[in-house]
C-alpha cells in the first residue's frame, strides 16, 4: 500500500474543509526523524500565506478536521505549522499482515501504460565496453520496475547497425577473401574494423570501393545485405553473452537498430518540407529552431539531410520517436542515453513536436546519466589508457569475488561456490553503479564495491542471507505463523513502517527512473533489521505471540529485500 498517498488524500480533504482551494498541495513526506512522527504534512505554511492566515491557526483547523481514526495514534503541530503524523501500531501491524499475504507485497496494481524504454545501444562490429554499462543496467532496472508495477514495457535496443563503417567492413572482408563471416568471433571483427579503417584512411581506391558498398547496401544489394546481416548477427550473439552474464533482460528480439527507420527518412524530410519546417540551405535540408540560438544569436539550424543525400542521427531520432508512438503505441518513452546527447535529443524532439508526430500528452524523457570514472577522476580506462572491455571487467569482478567468498567459505561445494561468486561479483559491479544518482559521474573502486559493509551488493546479499537463516534455524515457514501480529517495541514499529513504504519507493523509481532511491531504501531496511535483530529476541522471545510477530517481520523483510534487489537485476543467495 502507499501510505504517503493515503495520508495526502486525507490531509487534502481536511485542507479543503478548512477553506483551502481545491488542488492545494499538502506536501506529505516521510519524516526524517522519529521525533517528528512517521510522516509530516509540510504544505500548510504556503497555503496559509495564500489564505492570509497564520500557519499554526490553519494547522490547528486541519487537525480538527483530519480523519485519521484507526490510522494515526497521534497528530501534532510542530514549529511554525508542520503537521506530524504518528501511525497507529495496531494499524501498521494489520497492514504488514496484508502485505505478507498479498501478491507483490501489497503493492497496488497501476493503470497499465505501454512504455518504450531505449537502453544499451551498442555498436555493431565492436565489443561492448564499460561505456555501455550504465545505460544497460540502469535501463534494465527501469524496465524491471515498470513491469513489476504492471506496465506493458517494450525494450528498444537502438543498436548502431548502419553507416559508412559497413561499407569499409564489407569491402575489407572481400579484400581478404573471407566471406565466411559467420565463423568469425567478435574479436576478429574488431581487428577487421581497425584494419579496414586504416586501409580506408590510407588507400583512396579502397575508400571509393567502401563508399560504393555503402550505396549498394542502402539500395538493397543482396550480397551486401547478407554480409551486413552476418555482421549484425555475430555482434548480437556476442552481446547476448554479456547481457546474460549481467542478468539483464534484453534479447535479440529487442533489437531495434538504426536501420529499422531507413525507409521512413525520405518521407520525414519530404513531410517536414511540406509543413514549412524544413528548408534548403546550401544544398542541405535544414530545420531552424527558434528555441536554440547559434553563437550569433540566430535560430540554430539542425541538418536533417546532407548535400550528398545522406541522413543524420537527428533524422533517425525523429523517425524513431514517430515510430514508437504511431507503430508501437507508446504512452511514454524513456531514453537511457548519456548526458552528452541531451541537446541533440532535445532538438530532435522539438522537431517531432512541431511536426505533430508525437502529441505533448506522450512524454519523451531523457533519463541521462554521468560517466564512470577511475580513481584519478578521469574516464575509466585500462592501465595502458585503452577502453576497458565489458567482458574483461566482469571476469575481474568474478575473480575478485571468488577470492572473497572462498576465503570465508572454504568448505562450500564447488557448484554452490560458483553460483554465489557470480551473483556477488556481478551484483557488486551493478549495485555500485545503481546506488549512485544516475545524473552524476561516479568513481569505480573495486575495494568499495566488494566491501561487506556499507551500501554495497555484498552487504545487501549478506543481509538477505542473515534474515533467511532465522527461518532455517527455526525450521519453520510462513504456514506456521498463525497468531496475529502485534507490535510492542520501537524497533519493531520502525522496521514494520519502513517495510510498508516499499510501494512509495518503487513508485518513485518508476516515475523518475532513479534506481539509487531503491538502493538507499534497501540499505536503510537492512540497517533497521540489523538493529531489530540485535535488540529483539526472535526465536527466544518472551511469548509465542511475540515470537511469531517477529518472525512475520523477518519474513516480510526477506521478501522485500529479495524483490527490491530483483528490480535492480541483482540476485540473492541463500548463504555467503
Swiss-Prot record:
Bridged cysteine pairs (disulfide): none
SMART domains, alphabetized: Arg_tRNA_synt_N, DALR_1
GO cellular component: cytoplasm
Protein name: Arginine--tRNA ligase
Known EC number: 6.1.1.19
Family the entry assigns: Belongs to the class-I aminoacyl-tRNA synthetase family.
Enzyme class name: ligase
Molecular function via GO: arginine-tRNA ligase activity; ATP binding
Domain of life of the source: Bacteria
Quaternary organization: Monomer.
Organism listed in the record: Yersinia enterocolitica serotype O:8 / biotype 1B (strain NCTC 13174 / 8081)
Acetylation found in the keyword field: no
Record GO biological process: arginyl-tRNA aminoacylation
Keywords for this protein: Aminoacyl-tRNA synthetase, ATP-binding, Cytoplasm, Ligase, Nucleotide-binding, Protein biosynthesis
Location of this chain's protein in the cell: Cytoplasm
Pfam family, one: DALR_1
Coiled coil: none
Span of the annotated motif 'HIGH' region: 122-132
Reactions accelerated catalytically: tRNA(Arg) + L-arginine + ATP = L-arginyl-tRNA(Arg) + AMP + diphosphate
HAMAP family: Arg_tRNA_synth (MF_00123)
Database matches in InterPro entries: aa-tRNA-synth_I_CS, Arg-tRNA-ligase, Arg-tRNA-synth_N, Arg-tRNA-synth_N_sf, ArgRS_core, DALR_anticod-bd, Rossmann-like_a/b/a_fold, tRNAsynth_Ia_anticodon-bd
PROSITE patterns: AA_TRNA_LIGASE_I
Amino acid at each position: 500500500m502507499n501510505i504517503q498517498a493515503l495520508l495526502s488524500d486525507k490531509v487534502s480533504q481536511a485542507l479543503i474543509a478548512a477553506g483551502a482551494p481545491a488542488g492545494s498541495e499538502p506536501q506529505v513526506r516521510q519524516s526524517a526523524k522519529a521525533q517528528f512522527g512517521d510522516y509530516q504534512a509540510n504544505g500548510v505554511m504556503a497555503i496559509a500565506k495564500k489564505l492570509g492566515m497564520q500557519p499554526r491557526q490553519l494547522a490547528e483547523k486541519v487537525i480538527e478536521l483530519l480523519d485519521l481514526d484507526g490510522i494515526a495514534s497521534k497528530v501534532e503541530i510542530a514549529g511554525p505549522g508542520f503537521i506530524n503524523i504518528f501511525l497507529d501500531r495496531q494499524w501498521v501491524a494489520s497492514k504488514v499482515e496484508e502485505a505478507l499475504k498479498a501478491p507483490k507485497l501489497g503493492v497496488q496494481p497501476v493503470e497499465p501504460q505501454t512504455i518504450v524504454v531505449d537502453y544499451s545501444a551498442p555498436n555493431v562490429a565492436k565489443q561492448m565496453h564499460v561505456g555501455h554499462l550504465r545505460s544497460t543496467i540502469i535501463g534494465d532496472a527501469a524496465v524491471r520496475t515498470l513491469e513489476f508495477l504492471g506496465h506493458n514495457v517494450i525494450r528498444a535496443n537502438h543498436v548502431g547497425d548502419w553507416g559508412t563503417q559497413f561499407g569499409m567492413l564489407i569491402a575489407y572482408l572481400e579484400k581478404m577473401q573471407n566471406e565466411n563471416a559467420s565463423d568469425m568471433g567478435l574479436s576478429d571483427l574488431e581487428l577487421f574494423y581497425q584494419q579496414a579503417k586504416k586501409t580506408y584512411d590510407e588507400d583512396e581506391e579502397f575508400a571509393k570501393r567502401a563508399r560504393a558498398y555503402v550505396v549498394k547496401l542502402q539500395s538493397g544489394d543482396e550480397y551486401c545485405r547478407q554480409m551486413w546481416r552476418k555482421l549484425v548477427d555475430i555482434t548480437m550473439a556476442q552481446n547476448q553473452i554479456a547481457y546474460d552474464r549481467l542478468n539483464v533482460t534484453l534479447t535479440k528480439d529487442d533489437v531495434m537498430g538504426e536501420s529499422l527507420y531507413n525507409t521512413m527518412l525520405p518521407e520525414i524530410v519530404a513531410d517536414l518540407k511540406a509543413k514549412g519546417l524544413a528548408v534548403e540551405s546550401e544544398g542541405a535540408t535544414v530545420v531552424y529552431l527558434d528555441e536554440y540560438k547559434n553563437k550569433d544569436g540566430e535560430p540554430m539550424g539542425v541538418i536533417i539531410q546532407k548535400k550528398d543525400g545522406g541522413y543524420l542521427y537527428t533524422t533517425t531520432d525523429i523517425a524513431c520517436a514517430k515510430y514508437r508512438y504511431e507503430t508501437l503505441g507508446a504512452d511514454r518513452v524513456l531514453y537511457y542515453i548519456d548526458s552528452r546527447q541531451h541537446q541533440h535529443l532535445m532538438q530532435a524532439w522539438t522537431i517531432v513536436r512541431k511536426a505533430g508526430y508525437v502529441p505533448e500528452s506522450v512524454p519523451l524523457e531523457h533519463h541521462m546519466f554521468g560517466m564512470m570514472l577511475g580513481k584519478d577522476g578521469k574516464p575509466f580506462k585500462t592501465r595502458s589508457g585503452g577502453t576497458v572491455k565489458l567482458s574483461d571487467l566482469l571476469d575481474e569482478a568474478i575473480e575478485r569475488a571468488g577470492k572473497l567468498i572462498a576465503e570465508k567459505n572454504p568448505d562450500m561445494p564447488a557448484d554452490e561456490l560458483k553460483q554465489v561468486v557470480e551473483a556477488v561479483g556481478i551484483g557488486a559491479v551493478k549495485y555500485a553503479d545503481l546506488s549512485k544518482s544516475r545524473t552524476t559521474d561516479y568513481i569505480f573502486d573495486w575495494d568499495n564495491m566488494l566491501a561487506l559493509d556499507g551500501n554495497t551488493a555484498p552487504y545487501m546479499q549478506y543481509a538477505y542471507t542473515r534474515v533467511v537463516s532465522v527461518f532455517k534455524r527455526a525450521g519453520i515457514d510462513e504456514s506456521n505463523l498463525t497468531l496475529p501480529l502485534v507490535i510492542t517495541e520501537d524497533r519493531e514499529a520502525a522496521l514494520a513502517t519502513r517495510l510498508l513504504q516499499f510501494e512509495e519507493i518503487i513508485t518513485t523509481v518508476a516515475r523518475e527512473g532513479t534506481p539509487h532511491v531503491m538502493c538507499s531504501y534497501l540499505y536503510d531496511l537492512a540497517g533497521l533489521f540489523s538493529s531489530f535483530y540485535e535488540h529483539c529476541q526472535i526465536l527466544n522471545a518472551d511469548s509465542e505471540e511475540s515470537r511469531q510477530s517477529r518472525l512475520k517481520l523477518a519474513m516480510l523483510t526477506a521478501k522485500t529485500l529479495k524483490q527490491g534487489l530483483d528490480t535492480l537485476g541483482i540476485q540473492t543467495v541463500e548463504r555467503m
